[in-house]
C-alpha cells in the first residue's frame, strides 16, 4: 500500500471548461492524469486536494466522478476547493456516490481517515485572495472550525494535513490555520490551488517544523505525489 496526493484536476467531461485552452502543460491533461495514475496501486489511497470538477452540481459532475472512481486506488479522499461548486452536504454527496456506484470516493470534511497509523486531516482553508469582512469572516471561521474538528478526530496519531489553499505564500501567512497545525502537532501539510508562474513562489520544504508541499496537478505534471508506503 502507498499514500498519494494530487489536487486541481479541474475535470470538465460534462461541462465546457476544459483546461486545455490554457495551453502549456494543460494540453491533453485528462490523458496525462490517466497515465500519471498508473503509478498508483489497487490498494493505495489518494487524497484529492480540491478543484476536482467544473461541474455546477453533483449530476453535472457525474462523468468527472466516474473518471476519478475508475482510476487506480482503493480510496480517493475528496477535499473541497474554491471551484468545486458541486459540493453539497456530506450526507448528500455520500448518498450520490453510493447510488452512482462510485465505490472508491470518500469525503474529507469535518472528519479524518487513517492510513498506516497516520491521521489524514483537512479542509479547504483560506487564502489572501478572499477578502475578510462580513460574510467572508463567517466562512473563514467555519473553515477553522472544520479544520479543528478534523484534527481533533485524529486523536494522538501523527497528523498529515491536506488543504486546498496554501497557508503560506510569499509574504502571506494564514496565521490562524498555521496556529492550528502547530497546536495539533501536524508534521506535513499538502496543498494545491497554485498554477503556472505561482509555482515558483510556493512554500515548499520545512518551515517552523512543518514540511509543506505543493501538489497542484500541473505542478506534479499530473502524476500523484507519493507521500509514503
Residue ranges and their predicted role:
Residues 87, 117, 189, 221-226:
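Short, charged, surface-exposed secondary-structure boundary motifs
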Residues 9-16, 69-70, 87-176, 180:
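Conserved catalytic scaffold of divalent metal-dependent phosphoesterases
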Residues 113-116, 201-208, 225:
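Short loop/helix-cap segments at secondary-structure boundaries that form the rim of catalytic
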Residues 56, 168-171, 198:
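Short, solvent-exposed loop/turn segments at secondary-structure junctions
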Residues 2, 15-115, 173-186, 208-217:
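Core catalytic region of metal-dependent phosphoesterases/phosphodiesterases
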Residues 187-202, 219, 223:
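Short, flexible loop segments at boundaries between secondary-structure elements
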Residues 3-5, 47-49, 120, 160-162, ...:
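Structural motif
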Residues 7-11, 50-53, 82-84, 111, ...:
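Active-site metal-binding loops of divalent metal-dependent hydrolases
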